[in-house]
């Protein structure tokens, strides 16, 4: 197939998923071209030897003061703000080139800014498949402390109502466009059943689960000597739950308390500093690291004794499976997609977001050699049998071939069916 790809992703799990899919499809002989912008992460270390053709089109992100003022007035009438206009201009320019390229299918990945890509409304000559990692959770969940639609405290001061008049109306416009754009795609793929449930809650429609996989060649089991420390992976942001991990380690008696090594590629600032201070207060040796090479990451996955996974409602999460591939058991909070990748008592231990319960699970893995060896063996087989790279490419390839093989009438019927509510 001749496949066009569009994305606006930063570094992280979504970008790794994109690279894996492109690599796997390219190795099977499919011709691939990528559309993106300078603000996205297009370094693609996993694709250096394949060198797919990359088109970088302008995406304006800077908003001038007068545009901000105009957006505020426009929000009163539920008009589009400049951010949406800029993204639509970029998406339309990309779509014009894709429409003219005679592709068999378009694979669209998530948008770092809006989550839901806008490009679907402009692609009219080619079947289009959206791989959506998650909806815009800020618009539909209590994030981080309250739902963004929650009314402010009662007040009689007009100045205090600015957020309600302008900011919240802009959010409502974003949500309007998010829902409208969802229905422009011929098929929507998701990374877990949890993500599929999120689609139903956000859009009233489900997608199709298309599981990702792990390339064992990139995360090999090296059979190195294990050291008594706990490892965490994830950006230094609040939703990764680093505070939960620190509190869990702190429940382990001081004389046997392991250090907590945390590896992340992004984030910092106030939350990062707060976690360093929290660890000091709790008596936890906390070693945050950033931007490790693949070789360094694999080595530490092969020398740690346990991975603690505390992300909040993570839609999928690569880290537990990467750890399993390296023979590392996982202690995880039972939230989000991790309930599909970590089976309690098989390749790890799953429990509630309770530091005491998590700490007890960590101690069990750290101190019970028989349990550790059992989880290690199961973990490697779990990845090999259920989450292989080749199987994940089989799934995405089949989904794209199905979309490419549909006629215009069938695709139009599919698009209409997406608009029907689930009963």
Which functions belong to the PLM regions below?
Residues 189, 222-240, 246-250, 260-263:
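Conserved donor-binding/catalytic core segment of Leloir-type glycosyltransferases
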Residues 312:
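Aromatic "clamp/platform" in nucleotide-sugar-dependent glycosyltransferases that forms part
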Residues 136, 147-188, 196-197:
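Membrane-proximal helix-turn-helix segments that form the acceptor-binding/catalytic region
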Residues 344-345, 349-356, 364-370:
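Conserved acidic donor-binding segment of nucleotide-sugar-dependent glycosyltransferases
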């Amino acid at each position: 197939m001749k496949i066009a790809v569009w994305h606006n992703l930063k570094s992280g799990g979504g970008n790794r998923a994109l690279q894996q899919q492109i690599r796997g499809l390219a190795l099977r002989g499919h011709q691939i071209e990528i559309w993106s912008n300078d603000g996205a992460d297009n370094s693609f270390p996993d694709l250096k030897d394949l060198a797919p053709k990359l088109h970088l089109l302008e995406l304006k992100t800077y908003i001038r003061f007068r545009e901000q003022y105009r957006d505020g007035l426009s929000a009163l009438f539920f008009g589009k703000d400049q951010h949406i206009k800029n993204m639509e201009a970029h998406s339309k320019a990309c779509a014009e080139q894709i429409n003219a390229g005679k592709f068999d299918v378009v694979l669209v990945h998530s948008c770092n800014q809006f989550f839901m890509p806008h490009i679907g409304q402009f692609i009219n000559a080619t079947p289009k498949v959206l791989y959506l990692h998650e909806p815009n959770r800020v618009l539909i969940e209590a994030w981080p402390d309250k739902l963004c639609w929650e009314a402010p405290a009662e007040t009689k001061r007009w100045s205090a109502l600015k957020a309600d008049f302008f900011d919240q109306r802009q959010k409502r416009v974003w949500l309007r466009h998010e829902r409208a754009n969802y229905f422009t795609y011929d098929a929507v793929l998701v990374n877990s059943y949890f993500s599929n449930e999120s689609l139903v809650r956000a859009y009233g429609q489900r997608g199709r689960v298309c599981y990702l996989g792990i390339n064992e060649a990139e995360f090999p089991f090296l059979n190195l000597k294990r050291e008594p420390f706990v490892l965490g992976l994830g950006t230094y942001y609040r939703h990764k739950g680093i505070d939960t991990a620190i509190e869990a380690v702190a429940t382990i008696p001081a004389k046997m308390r392991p250090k907590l090594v945390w590896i992340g590629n992004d984030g910092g600032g106030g939350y990062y500093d707060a976690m360093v201070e929290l660890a000091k207060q709790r008596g936890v040796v906390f070693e945050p690291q950033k931007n490790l090479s693949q070789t360094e990451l694999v080595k530490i996955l092969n020398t740690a004794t346990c991975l603690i996974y505390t992300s909040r409602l993570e839609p999928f999460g690569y880290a537990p499976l990467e750890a399993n591939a390296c023979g590392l058991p996982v202690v995880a909070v039972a939230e989000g997609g991790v309930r599909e990748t970590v089976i309690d008592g098989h390749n790890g231990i799953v429990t509630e977001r309770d530091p005491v319960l998590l700490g007890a699970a960590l101690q069990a893995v750290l101190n019970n050699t028989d349990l550790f060896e059992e989880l290690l063996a199961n973990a490697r087989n779990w990845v090999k049998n259920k989450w292989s790279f080749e199987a994940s490419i089989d799934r995405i390839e089949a989904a794209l071939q199905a979309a490419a093989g549909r006629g215009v009438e069938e695709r139009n019927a599919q698009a209409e069916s997406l608009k029907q509510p689930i009963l």
